[in-house]
Amino acid sequence: MSCFVGDFFGRAPQARARMRRGLLFAGYLLAALLLSHWFFHSGVLSKVDTLFHLNRVMGIAAGLAAGDFPVYLHGYQMQGFGTADGVLYPDLLLYVPALLVVCGVPLAAAYHAYWVLVVFLGLAAAWRGYTLLTGRAFVGLLAALLFSSSYFLLFCLGTSVGAYVAISFLPYAFGALYALLRQPRGTRAWPELVLAFTVIAESHVINTLFFLLAAPFCVFAWRRGLADRVRRRGLWRAALFSLLVNGWRLAAFAFFYARVDFHIRHPFFASLAIMTSDAGNLFAAQFWWGWPLCLLAAAAVLARAFRRRRLFLLTLAFCVFLTSLIWSGFPWRTVEQLPWVGHVLGMFQFSMRLLPLGLLPLALFLARYLAVFCRTAARRLGAGCAGRAAALLLALGAVAYGLQAAAQTAFTMGGVDIRWQVAYEQVTELPSFGPRVQPDYLYADVEPEALFASGEVPAPGEVRAVAGEAAVSSFAKRGTRLSFAYVSPAGAEVQVPLFFYPGYQAWVDGAPLAVAEGAHHVLTLSLPAGAHEVSVRYTGPWFFRASALVSLASLMVFFFLWACEWRRAHA
């Protein structure tokens, strides 16, 4: 033990460096445990979209259990008829809880394990991103903690399985882009940019669009690095591999979105002006910043000396503008009447989704201010070594306060009372449709509750003859795969309990069988006479499989090049 202590403290510079690293890791670990403590519970955290996200997990699990990968269609939702959520909702990290469910882990435990995982990953990604932006791990951690303490991000915690991950990885993506273009040793940062973008693109569509819209402005602002040929090559590599690695989802998304009219293309809120709040309710929602960020911003404005003060004030003004978009007095209806603008804005659904684009750089400036303020105050008190610890404790306090505030949600938006307290529910039987299970990527003209109640479609496990006669036996279904045997004296046209989507294939005794779209978009088969066995599965159009192979090959090449970059950097 004495040898260990002597080795640890024998050299003051090494000892201080180890203590700093230990302090940073302890701060990260404590913050991650604070942010994830809601999920160390036997029940399922009860939030508005919980049942919907559990359905997504079960849809992926059903596909994996059937041997499908990727799982394009979720065969659990809508009484097993299936939805296109797997194509149009990015859900890469949801494969983790789905795989746990397949392995026998209870659904509630698997879902909470997902949230614990993404909290730790998201905070680490934000820390890494801010470190790349500042070149200092300590300021990077402070910025990550302040960003994670924002009321908006904590509102998403437990509510939006994709948005929380994507927003947490935005600092990483922008940090990797900055390092690639501006940092002295950042020429090898392009693989990190690909990694960060892939997580964003495979988690949330809207935040992917936000990054793609903001990235050109960042490249222009940091354009000095484009003069370096190595940096230009790295930027092109990042763009190319980001496209190739995620091409499998892009191809499927574009195909379906262009051909199928889904519920989500007809938003419930016709205008962004609907989901807004008056000044009093904005105050109750802490302006979606959280009081710690508001107080730090006010203190930074009043500070006499502040590095890059003009840029900070511009960032603050931008945040205030984005916050005003959530105010009921903002003229959204007038803005939406502008040519092309209204159609594009409708995709965002809620104006508050824009706010992280302002909070992200604001957290960086506030972290710098907090670090300088605590260091200066500690020196004046004769305790210079306590400055870092004080700043870290204040940032952790902001996270703790934000969690406490988010656990007592109470404000009004769009005339709707939004109230929530930490509560859990026991999901013994998971409904596959109905309240809290949104039919976002179901045909827009299908209302599942009314349709299933009408009896106009087959019941689960039923093969219904709509023309001719067929005696069915040995029916089996898992995910979007089903099989059955039948006997028909003269052939029959039957409906099976699946919604039709382009890409279904069927076989009768191993020979291809034509599939068609019947009434209410139900998959219909024309069966030949005799005794036969039928199997149905979703494979997707041929270019789905081709794009998946290209993405897989690109991923392997990407990791090989990343390994080469890493070896050169550590040679």
Q: Which stretches of residues belong to each language-model region?
A:
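Active-site-proximal, structured, solvent-exposed surfaces of multi-pass membrane proteins
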Residues: 17, 455-571
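Membrane-embedded transmembrane-helix bundle of lipid-linked glycan/lipid transferases
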Residues: 2-415, 531-537, 544-571
